[in-house]
């Protein structure tokens, strides 16, 4: 870690320090802090000149923190909206996974010997106790919050807020105010696309995390803290960028296999303690209100909020990186609004990482033919082309005991050897002439000698005699004379690569050197000439055990830890030496094969109406043969029905006991319902529509009561849930995509 150093004027500084670094006074915050610059308003007005003066300092540490000039009392225009009054237009929820363990780093550096620091005003967060008025109390509270954050990160969902309200101008920096008018958005290093003429603010709550991200090699990023709680920021300089990428690939092997640029997804966080333990230089700082953090090209940085906070972010090109363009001021430096999403600056496709290097694959797919025989389409030889059409004929390969035809994977040396065994007139002198200038020694047998043991023995004998070496080829004879009888399908072919995977490890390719059927394993030559014995169960073929494994083997059921929560805070996490890792924990509905289902609201429909509709469809009646029913007759019939039903249920009857009263009541209600339905059917059979409506209005018993509606709705058959399947990719796209694409709701069927 860097010690606390304060550089003086160029004449008094070390010779290794450039004079550009010393023109502006700065100091280092703590043992692992970044430079803090407190410029005057005259030094900060011209942003382009300011960046030039601190360029080497920023490249060394990766970022610098700029404190608001003391002469600027109100940095924002009073006519515009204050940051505290801004309402977020969109809130997103997402999970951030942690890779690596977090532990406290004990520093042996004496903080008392640090260089002098200029006094600054400490803004104590509202979340901390009110008695934390001194800087020491503030730092202690921040340290406790950071430790609690890393211990409980994977147990909470994080919230992110965005708004498209009019931007707040930096009127005290004229160069930035002028540059904001252009709003040029750098997408895939294209200088034509234009950013919408609106501002973008970012809001976060407690534990809202900005995972590790990196800017374009030509871009500077400025993070402006508009108000609210502080943010903890981590910075990795560009000099350690490659080391960080390699370490990230080792810690997150699954994500690295799915996409080699998985860091651009911004869904994995690596604790700084793990990085420091592996030799990655990591700086940290606490960004407070009215402070700016400027990151330089190639710098990886990450942050999380210690409370409610509002940020503003924009990026611009470096004057020296844009050598092909003549930029006279910062307005032409392509200042643009930029969200906390790498997709806006780093569009990429999700392609799995190549398991073997290009050199390793070229060993299989490239010919050792002269340049004149290589086609113009590329270095790869056509699959169906033969090496020498004159020396081979199709009739030589009709019988099962004959030598297999030459393969495009065979070299000239292998093809010549095969031709020697097919031709009866070729002499040893002609054969020796074929090996002139041959420097490459084959480690495996030619493909033409796989199923012909006699030719194989002759080939090994000739190889030892002509090369004069003691290359030991295995004398293993295949047990299966036919490929169809081999346990693996398709059967292994010597010299060809096959995919393999041990347990839940990474997928790798290996060239088949031997097929040990008696031991049920293959001898594979992997990258860097490593020879590995792989059982048949680990070969990824359609007939192997690995090919028949269920999805649960690769996505096992995870057990949630027994953690007690009190108002959302785990209270017994101290009982564990370390919290169990929940990095791969996802909701059951988001697992593959279990799509998200949406059940629409059920419309309640009375059973009586459905019964009437069924009767009308099953027994149609003609309105010509049926005479209209007078209204008076209907009323009389209804009164007689009610009187009849009242006489049925007699409480004085000894048969109607306390236990049998409910059965009698059910039967009476059923009879009443049947009579009512018959009356309704007669009403609907009337030919005159006006008479029918009149009858319905006058008949009170025809209209079902509220109790009838509730009983009928309870007996309805529920419809099957409509499957609005949303894949896991769509879910991740919704929670992590940039704001300008979120407005396109065609990506989310459930939100249309």
Curated annotation (Swiss-Prot):
Domain JmjN: 34-75
GO cellular component: chromatin; cytosol; Lid2 complex; nucleus
Region (Disordered): 391-438
Source species of the chain: Schizosaccharomyces pombe (strain 972 / ATCC 24843)
Quaternary organization: Component of the Lid2 complex composed of ash2, jmj3, lid2, sdc1 and snt2.
Protein name: Lid2 complex component jmj3
Location(s), subcellular: Nucleus
SMART domains reported in the protein's UniProt record: JmjC (SM00558), JmjN (SM00545)
GO molecular-function terms, A-Z: histone H3K36 demethylase activity; histone H3K9 demethylase activity
Domain of life: Eukaryota
GO biological process: chromatin remodeling; regulation of gene expression
């Amino acid at each position: 870690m860097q010690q606390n150093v304060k550089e003086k004027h160029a004449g008094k500084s070390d010779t290794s320090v450039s004079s550009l670094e010393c023109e502006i006074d700065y100091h280092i915050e703590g043992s692992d802090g970044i430079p803090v610059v407190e410029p005057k308003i005259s030094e900060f007005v011209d942003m382009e000149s300011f960046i030039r003066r601190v360029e080497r300092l920023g490249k060394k540490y990766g970022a610098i923190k700029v404190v608001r000039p003391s002469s600027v009392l109100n940095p924002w225009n009073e006519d515009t909206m204050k940051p505290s009054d801004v309402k977020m237009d969109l809130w997103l929820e997402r999970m951030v996974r942690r890779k690596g363990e977090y532990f406290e780093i004990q520093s042996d550096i004496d903080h008392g010997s640090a260089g002098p620091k200029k006094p600054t005003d400490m803004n104590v967060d509202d979340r901390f106790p009110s008695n934390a008025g001194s800087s020491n109390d503030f730092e202690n509270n921040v340290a406790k919050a950071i430790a609690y954050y890393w211990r409980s990160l994977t147990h909470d969902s994080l919230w992110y807020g965005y708004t498209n309200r009019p931007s707040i101008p930096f009127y005290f920096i004229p160069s930035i105010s002028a540059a904001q008018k252009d709003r040029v958005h750098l997408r895939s290093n294209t200088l034509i696309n234009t950013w919408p003429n609106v501002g973008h603010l970012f809001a976060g709550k407690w534990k809202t995390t900005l995972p590790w991200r990196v800017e374009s090699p030509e871009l500077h990023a400025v993070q402006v803290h508009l108000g609210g709680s502080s943010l903890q920021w981590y910075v990795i300089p560009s000099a350690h960028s490659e080391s960080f990428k390699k370490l990230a690939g080792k810690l997150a092997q699954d994500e690295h296999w799915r996409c080699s640029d998985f860091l651009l997804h911004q869904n994995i966080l690596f604790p700084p303690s793990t990085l420091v333990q592996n030799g990655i230089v990591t700086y940290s700082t606490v960004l407070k209100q009215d402070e700016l953090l400027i990151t330089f090209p190639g710098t990886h940085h990450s942050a999380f909020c210690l409370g409610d906070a509002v940020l503003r972010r924009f990026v611009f090109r470096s004057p020296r990186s844009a050598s092909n363009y003549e930029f006279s001021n910062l307005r032409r430096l392509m200042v643009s609004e930029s969200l906390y999403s790498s997709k806006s600056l780093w569009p990429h496709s999700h392609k799995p990482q190549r398991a073997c290097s290009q050199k390793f694959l070229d060993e299989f797919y490239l010919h050792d033919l002269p340049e004149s025989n290589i086609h113009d389409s590329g270095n790869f030889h056509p699959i169906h082309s033969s090496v020498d059409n004159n020396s081979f004929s199709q009739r030589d390969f009709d019988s099962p005991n004959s030598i297999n035809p030459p393969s495009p994977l065979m070299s000239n040396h292998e093809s010549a050897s095969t031709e020697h065994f097919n031709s009866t007139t070729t002499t040893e002198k002609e054969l020796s002439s074929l090996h002139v200038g041959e420097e490459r020694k084959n480690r495996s047998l030619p493909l033409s000698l796989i199923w012909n043991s006699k030719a194989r023995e002759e080939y090994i004998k000739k190889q030892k005699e002509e090369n004069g070496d003691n290359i030991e080829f295995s004398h293993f004879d295949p047990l299966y004379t036919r490929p169809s009888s081999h346990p693996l399908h398709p059967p292994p072919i010597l010299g060809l690569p096959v995919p393999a995977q041990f347990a839940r490890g990474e997928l790798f390719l290996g060239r088949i050197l031997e097929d040990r059927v008696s031991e049920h394993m293959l001898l594979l030559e992997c990258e860097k000439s490593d020879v590995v014995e792989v059982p048949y169960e680990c070969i990824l073929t359609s007939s192997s055990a690995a090919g028949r494994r269920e999805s649960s083997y690769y996505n096992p059921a995870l057990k949630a830890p027994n953690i007690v929560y009190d108002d959302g805070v785990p209270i017994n996490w101290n009982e564990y030496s370390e919290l169990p890792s929940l990095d791969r924990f996802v909701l059951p509905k988001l697992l593959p094969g279990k799509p998200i289902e949406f059940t629409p609201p059920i419309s309640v429909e009375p059973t009586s109406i459905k019964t009437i509709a069924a009767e009308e469809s099953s027994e149609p009646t003609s309105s010509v043969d049926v005479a209209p029913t007078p209204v008076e007759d209907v009323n009389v019939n209804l009164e007689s029905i009610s009187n009849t039903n009242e006489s049925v249920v007699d409480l004085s009857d000894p048969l109607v006991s306390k236990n049998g009263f409910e059965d009698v009541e059910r039967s009476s209600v059923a009879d009443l319902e049947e009579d009512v339905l018959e009356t309704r059917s007669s009403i609907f059979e009337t030919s005159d529509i006006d008479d029918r409506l009149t009858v319905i209005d006058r008949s009170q018993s025809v209209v079902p009561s509220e109790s009838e509606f509730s009983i009928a709705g309870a007996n309805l058959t529920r419809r099957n849930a409509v499957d609005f399947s949303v894949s896991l990719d769509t879910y991740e796209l919704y929670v992590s995509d940039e704001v300008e694409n979120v407005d396109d709701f065609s990506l989310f069927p459930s939100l249309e």
